[in-house]
Curated annotation (Swiss-Prot):
InterPro entries: DEAD/DEAH_box_helicase_dom, Helicase_ATP-bd, Helicase_C-like, P-loop_NTPase, RNA-helicase_DEAD-box_CS, RNA_helicase_DEAD_Q_motif. The gene is DED1. This is ATP-dependent RNA helicase DED1. The lineage of its organism: Eukaryota, Fungi, Dikarya, Ascomycota, Pezizomycotina. Belongs to the DEAD box helicase family. DDX3/DED1 subfamily. Pfam families: DEAD, Helicase_C. Residues 1-143, 582-613 are annotated as: Disordered.
Length: 675
């Protein structure tokens, strides 16, 4: 390790590596080898005592851990954690504090319009307009709601949105394939967008459309189906919300079906006209928050439903009106079975992060929603699929859901952005905590997102950071929805600028101002790596992504090298060495193999470049998506002589595609947090 890692002056101990602290206070690299300063009392406004640590006036074992230097170092960090953060309550009381597993942050109050009981957010602030005599009449302005939705100024850190730095990125390559592709737009203007929507876009401080929005707005407004493949952080959410809401404002609500007559009171059924499906609770909540912004003062009432929250509050929200529904597949199936939602009026169907929903075993629910209920047929609706990657097998599946669609590929999708400086460091497992502390001390500003592989590691690492006087919290599937929402909110606003996360937060979340992403544990699939580091460098901004690599990660070494080369990043020599070792040992990709076709088809329209099979040999013998079903034979149903996608007995590694039916998309014993 000593020969391979260069961390800006990091000095190692006599054993050749820097081990965990073992009861000693952490000493930053530039202070090592010096004598400790004399004891000093706490400075005014210094950080609170955390996690039952020693009093602020007492020096650490090396005379440094609680010195004036430590207080000064905190004061230099962005947002000045010490000014307005309540005292952490310690490990003996797991119900509060940044890292407490029992309750997340202990402060009260709600945010983003969410209800206090962990249920669904209300539609407050939207749906105030009317549709009268064939015209859209916006509601009156509400300064309080505007502050909540859009912030006080464009520089408001709690509401500032990425997507405003694309003015200098007009040269981003865009590929649009299909018949009669409309010309892109270059401004948010009327037409093609509705005048009221343009006012809301201005309130949100959007300046110019992002590349994906330039093309998606005229495509969707023209009535075409769309498969959009665009980099994470490129404005995909606005890419489908803008044209859908604009058409709603122009055309008005749909008539209630004749068979809905006589439905009154609490048991009446909702008939949304737009349905947006996404894989995780966090992502649907984020899309809902964005839809509230752009539906402000309009007749459109957005609603959101997801598992893990009180279904009663979600039903009450739907009863107040539901025109645009954002949902996870599992909870939507539940509400359909209860007879509370009908898809009879759907004009727009959006599948966001479509490849992830299929990876997570949601295909049975999606097929039931799209093909097995009362949703209009493919010819009678518009269907939009958005994601950062669309491997060839997912494109083949799109033939069942889309008609005469336009394939849109923006930028070098399926890869990473040059706005992200990627660093890969060789770090053995025993050294990870020590190297992490070095990085956190050397990158003092902005928000840091740390990815780990297990829920236990997320809690353990956040507790460790708190013990080292770093305000940190964790987010993972075992936390309640309310705890996860609080953790994300305090991470967004900078009160808790270090977030340790499992894969539950890896995809889709739009958290502005994340300046550093650290892959403490590398994933086994390079696509997951792409999505993780996509949390920084969003929408033209710059960011840093650091990965801790060792020989345990050799399964993705070749694809990681390809990504680094494609993004014009430095490829460390040790990656070349381990790649050669793997070639002799027969090593290869450790994760899922996307049909053996690598990443070559992830960004191109298979209709142009050919689409024989799903890639590789995994479709031999008549297997594949359509006839694997829930036979327990896996993704390829015996094709290519393998057990299929799940590596065992089915898509989710359980029994058949879902293992556990509609209730748990990943089978018994798997995480239920995804839905």
């Amino acid at each position: 390790m000593a020969d391979q890692i260069n961390m800006g002056g990091l000095s190692l101990n006599e054993g050749g590596h820097q081990g965990p602290p073992q009861g000693r206070s952490y000493i930053p690299p530039h202070m090592r080898g010096r004598g400790g300063p004399p004891p000093a009392g706490p400075q005014a406004g210094g950080p609170p005592v955390m996690n039952g640590g020693p009093p602020a006036a007492a020096p650490g074992p090396n005379g440094i851990g609680n010195s004036a230097w430590a207080n000064q170092n905190y004061g230099a960090r962005q947002n000045n954690w010490s000014n307005d953060v309540p005292t952490y309550q310690g490990n003996n009381n797991r119900r509060g504090g940044w890292g407490g597993r029992g309750g997340g942050y202990s402060g009260g109050g709600n945010f983003d319009g969410h209800s206090g009981g962990g249920g669904a957010p209300t539609a407050r602030g939207s749906g105030d307009g009317q549709w009268r005599d064939g015209k859209h009449i916006p509601g009156p302005a509400n300064p309080r709601v505007e502050r909540e939705l859009f912030g006080v100024t464009a520089e408001d850190p709690s509401k500032q949105h990425t997507g405003i730095n694309f003015e200098k990125y007009d040269d981003i390559p865009v590929e649009a394939s299909g018949t009669d592709v409309p010309e892109p737009v270059h401004q948010f203007t009327t037409p093609p967008l509705d005048e009221h929507l343009c006012r809301n876009i201005e309130l949100a401080h959007y300046k110019v459309p992002t590349p994906v929005q330039k093309y998606s707005i005229p495509i969707v407004s023209g009535g075409r189906d769309l498969m959009a493949c665009a980099q994470t952080g490129s404005g995909k959410t606005g890419g489908f919300l803008f044209p859908i809401l604009s058409q709603a404002f122009i055309n008005g609500p749909s008539a209630v079906p004749a068979n809905a007559a006589g439905q009154f009171g609490r048991q009446r059924k909702a008939y949304p006209t737009s349905l947006i499906l996404a894989p995780t609770r966090e992502l649907v909540s984020q899309i809902f928050d964005e839809s509230r912004k752009f539906a402000y003062r309009s007749w459109v009432r957005p609603c959101v439903v997801y598992g893990g929250a009180d279904i009663g509050s979600q039903l009450r929200q739907i009863e107040r009106g539901c025109d645009l529904l954002v949902a996870t597949p599992g909870r939507l199936v539940d509400l359909i079975e209860r007879g509370r939602i009908s898809l009879q009026n759907i004009k727009y169907l959006v599948l966001d992060e479509a490849d992830r929903m299929l990876d997570m075993g949601f295909e049975p629910q999606i097929r039931r929603i799209v093909e097995g209920e009362d949703m209009p047929q493919v010819q009678d609706r518009q269907t939009l699929m958005f994601s950062a990657t669309f491997p060839r097998d997912i494109q083949m599946l799109a033939r069942d859901f889309l008609k005469d669609y336009i394939f849109l590929s923006v930028g070098r999708v399926g890869s990473t952005s040059e706005n992200i400086t990627q660093k890969v460091e060789y770090v053995e497992d025993v050294d990870k905590r020590s190297v992490l502390l070095d990085i956190l001390h050397s990158h003092a500003n902005g928000l840091t997102l740390i990815f780990v592989e297990t829920k236990r590691m997320a809690d353990s690492l956040s507790d460790f950071l708190i013990n080292q006087n770093f305000p940190a919290t964790s987010i993972h599937g075992d936390r309640t929805q309310r705890e996860r929402e609080r953790a994300l909110e305090f991470f967004r606003n900078g009160r808790c600028p270090i977030l340790v996360a499992t894969a539950v937060a890896a995809r889709g979340l739009d958290i502005p101002h994340v300046t550093h992403v650290i892959n403490y544990d590398l994933p086994t699939d390079v696509d997951d790596y792409v999505h993780r580091i996509g949390r920084t460098g969003r929408a033209g901004n710059t960011g840093i992504a650091t990965a801790f690599f060792n020989r345990g990660n050799r399964g993705i070494v070749r694809e990681l090298m390809d990504l680094l080369k494609e993004a014009n990043q430095e490829v460390p020599a040790f990656l070349e060495t381990i790649a050669r070792e793997s070639s002799f040992g027969g090593g290869g990709r450790g994760g899922r193999s996307r049909g053996g076709g690598g990443r070559g088809g992830a960004t191109r329209d298979f209709r142009k470049f050919g689409g024989g099979g799903f890639g590789g040999n995994n479709n031999g013998g008549g297997g594949g998506f359509n006839n694997a079903g829930s036979q327990g034979a896996g993704f390829s149903a015996g094709g290519g002589g393998g057990a299929g996608y799940g590596g065992g007995a089915g898509y989710g590694g359980g029994a058949g595609y879902g293992g556990g039916g509609y209730g748990n998309p990943s089978g018994p014993g798997a995480q239920s947090s995804w839905w």
